[in-house]
Regions:
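Active-site-proximal, Lys/Arg-enriched surface segment
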Residues: 48, 81-188, 310
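An internal, acidic/charged active-site-proximal segment
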Residues: 184-188, 196-337
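Phosphate-ester processing/binding pockets and catalytic centers
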Residues: 35, 44, 54, 61-69, ...
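Electropositive nucleic-acid engagement tracts
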Residues: 35-39, 51-125, 132, 232, ...
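Basic, short loop/linker segments at the boundary and entry of helix-turn-helix/winged-helix-like folds
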Residues: 17-45
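Charged, often Cys/His-bearing segments associated with DNA-binding zinc-finger transcription factors
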Residues: 2-23
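A short catalytic or substrate-binding loop motif that flags glycine-/basic-rich loops and adjacent residues
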Residues: 54-56, 105-106, 127, 138-144, ...
């Protein structure tokens, strides 16, 4: 019988996985020596095949569709118990991809390393480190993992590089458990502002607990993880010149590391970020300098002052963008364009 997938009250027939996909077998031998035996290597190929051919890419569904074994726990045990090392597999993958694409990649000066994070939503809470993470797109808090990822782009070549799992501070440190332990008579606020004030009150006391302090030092911000991904790409000798990231990662620590590593960087700037007014001169439509009051001006206040004649058309593919360029200083970041 073919596996059946239930989707919102409907059942859809899925084709079984009877053998690894040809694209998998064509490249899998590169990884063969990283596995202890043939069974492990076969599970590895079946899992990759499931990720490619199945719409539902969960481990449970891939296991359901693999027909080679009556024991449907084999693939699960491969991930949870088998002594293989995913870091070595990814290292080998990157070496292989860079070697296979060296003739078609673009110049190093035009190559990008893109940093971003995403939400991998889950139905259940049995996964390690699953938590409620904020979704900026729809203002919700789904149950999910929140990996920070790096992606490589060079001409026609593009592939995922690496990831680091972000864990919220309260989940990483088991904060609520320690609060109940040290403050059994206190209730934990639910609103964001009240919770932040409560943190300031109780955290210094919690940090005196060696067990909490140990977990506290294990916490990594998304900026920390982005820097780790940048360092990993450099360690792998990935040829790129430009680091690309959104406004969430526009922080002094990441920018400083990019400069230290001699990488150009491109980011978005939130409209409420301040610019130092003494670092630039803005002129009106007739060329007269516009006087700006105070040491700082927010981006959202500056944009309406830019005359329409100052914009220039830039065409990329079939799209035209109207752009304005200005070199300014941002507090904490220094001079940027």
């Amino acid at each position: 019988p073919y596996p059946i997938l239930w989707v919102k009250g409907q059942h859809l027939m899925q084709l079984p996985i009877v053998a690894p996909a040809p694209v998998v077998t064509a490249h899998a031998d590169v990884f063969r020596d990283l596995f202890e035996n043939r069974c492990q290597f076969q599970h590895f190929q079946n899992y990759l095949t499931g990720l490619i051919v199945l719409d539902n890419k969960s481990l449970a569904n891939i296991t359901r569709c693999v027909l080679e074994s009556a024991d449907k726990t084999n693939l699960s045990r491969f991930f949870s118990e088998a002594p293989w090392f995913q870091e070595r597999v990814n290292d080998r993958r990157l070496v292989y991809l860079l070697d296979q694409t060296k003739e078609i990649r673009g110049p190093k000066a035009d190559a990008l390393l893109i940093l971003d994070d995403t939400l991998c939503e889950h139905v259940g809470s049995l996964f390690d480190y699953v938590d409620r993470h904020y979704n900026h797109g729809n203002d919700t808090y789904p149950l999910a993992h929140n990996p920070v990822t790096s992606h490589y782009v060079s001409g026609p070549v593009r592939f995922p590089m690496d990831l680091r799992l972000y864990r919220r501070y309260e989940e990483c440190t088991q904060w609520e458990t320690f609060v109940h332990q040290h403050f059994p008579d206190r209730s934990i606020p639910k609103t964001k502002k009240e919770r932040a004030r409560f943190h300031k009150e109780v955290d210094p006391i919690l940090l005196a607990d060696p067990n909490f302090q140990k977990l506290h030092h294990q916490f990594r911000t998304k900026i920390d993880l982005g820097i780790a991904l940048l360092e990993a790409a450099i360690q792998h000798k990935v040829p790129f010149r430009v680091l690309l990231f959104d406004s969430w990662y526009l922080a002094e620590e990441l920018v400083s590391m990019a400069r230290y590593r001699k990488k150009d960087w491109i980011s978005l700037l939130k409209k409420n970020r301040n610019l130092e007014t003494n670092s630039f001169v803005l002129k009106d439509a007739v060329g007269t300098p516009i006087r700006l009051e105070g040491p700082h001006i927010a981006v959202e206040e500056l944009v309406p002052l830019i005359p329409p004649t100052a914009y220039r058309a830039v065409t990329v593919g079939d799209k035209t963008y109207w752009t304005f360029t200005l070199a300014v200083r941002l507090p904490g970041l220094g001079k940027v364009r």
